[in-house]
Amino acid sequence: MKKTIVAVMVAASAVLSAQAMATNTAQVTVLGEVSDAANSCVVTPTGTLNNGIVQLITVTTTEANAEAAGKLFKTQDFGFDVKDCAQGSTSPVTAVTVNVSGTSSSDATILDNTAANGAAGIGIGIQRVSDAHRVAFDGSDTMSESYSATNGTQLKYTTGYVRTNAADLLPVD
């Protein structure tokens, strides 16, 4: 039986944010929710997640301009350990479904920079470590992940900056 985990990378609300790029920092905020006691799981953040936030390393416009458009760079790994799903249920869990959403415009795999006066031409992307699948943020990318009642499952991702086009980034006032 499949159980849906409603969380980013285990979450489905518009909770991913590409804000703060105007202040030389960027955060990917990840909020999670698992509901219904009969279908619940224990979800533990791993990697560089700290209170649901992945802090990306500062990138300069020179560094960003040297990268190819659409490519992840200055990445950070994060993930979730999922275990103890539907403990005691008569219907064992064999898979979890991961839904992701966020603000994207021209490319569903790139989160828009929504910071006030933020840098133009740069966003944030996330990809699954196991197969380098780029996550889409428009709700179209439902990913099924295997689950073992004995071992649980590890959801592993990497996130980083992405140039959104070939034009050079310009410094923000």
Would you name each region that the model predicts?
Residues 4, 20-173:
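Mature extracellular/passenger domains of Gram-negative fimbrial/pilin and adhesin proteins
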Residues 1-22:
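Gram-negative bacterial Sec-dependent N-terminal signal peptides
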